[in-house]
A protein has these predicted regions:
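Elongated, amphipathic alpha-helical interaction scaffolds
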Residues: 1-286
Length: 286
């Protein structure tokens, strides 16, 4: 197996790192600050934020974990996800998230589709998915023949790019927030004028100074390393037992890539399901 990446020190984590993002956003006030800036609104959440919320339609379906899931007083649902690696599938991944969230909103047999909540999905990345150098891309369904006609289905998907260039299209506060999310340090905070970003930084400093939180991070990292090693060795063994030289190389390469992306369940399925393995090889351009 390739050498495990060196563990990042807890104090060096940024909000783009899932562990710190999830722990920070469990604080309801932090999540409200984040949504206030991104959506330019005043947010009041009515229940505690859920992290790593698991969704699936049936036991046989693929499980999806939503990084940070919450609901405001108007029953608007928010899902926020930091994504450090460009898997080149974010538009369709956001579609999957939307579908799974919707499928869990109505009780079985209900046909009152107007009861579906408004849903806002937010993906935060340190790269530009769409190539137009924007900080913020907001998508709603609309009519091609009548562009000003919105479908008004209550679904919004927002993609945030920390490396945007068009300052005039977003608030200074959002730009400061995105810079801070990518590099959550004292130095970055010193250059932020936003009181909300400063408040968020104070909370992050408190988190990073918490020894129990540091121990939790170390334990989570060690468990993830063991899980990856076990899955990799299983894939390697199955490949050696069943495949040709080419197939063994494909399995090893795919397992390594899926480990980097923390897509462990998909890796385990790909080990024994050749059709699914080929699909992933094509998706990841391996």
């Amino acid at each position: 197996m390739t050498q495990t990446k060196e563990r990042k020190r807890f104090k060096d984590l940024n909000l783009l790192d899932r562990f710190l993002f999830a722990e920070a956003m469990e604080d309801q006030q932090n999540m409200e600050l984040l949504l206030d800036i991104i959506l330019n609104q005043e947010t009041h959440l009515k229940q505690p934020t859920q992290t790593e919320k698991e969704l699936r339609r049936t036991n046989e379906d693929r499980q999806v974990r939503l990084d940070v899931y919450t609901v405001d007083e108007k029953d608007v649902i928010y899902d926020a996800e930091p994504q450090k690696i460009n898997t080149k599938n974010f538009p369709k991944r956001s579609r999957l998230y939307q579908g799974l969230i919707d499928s869990n909103l109505l009780p079985p047999g209900s046909v009152d589709f107007n009861a579906l909540n408004t849903v806002v999905i937010i993906l935060i990345t340190p790269f530009d998915i769409f190539g137009h150098e924007l900080y913020k891309y907001t998508f709603h369904m609309k009519c091609e023949e009548v562009p000003e006609l919105q479908l008004d289905d209550g679904a919004t998907r927002i993609f945030l790019n920390t490396h945007g260039k068009h300052l005039e299209l977003v608030s200074e506060e959002l730009i400061e927030l995105l810079k801070y999310i990518e590099l959550s340090t004292d130095e970055t905070a010193e250059h932020c004028n936003s009181e909300k970003v400063q408040e968020l930084h104070r909370k992050i400093c408190q988190l990073k100074a918490n020894k129990q939180m540091e121990a939790k991070f170390m334990q989570a990292w060690e468990e993830k390393v063991l899980e990856r090693q076990e899955a990799y060795e299983e894939g390697k063994q199955v490949g050696e037992e069943r495949g040709t030289d080419r197939e063994r190389q494909e399995v090893a390469k795919l397992c390594g890539r899926l480990m980097e992306l923390n897509r462990m369940e998909e890796m385990q399925r790909a080990i024994t399901d050749m059709t699914y393995r080929k699909k992933l090889l094509s998706e990841l351009e391996l």
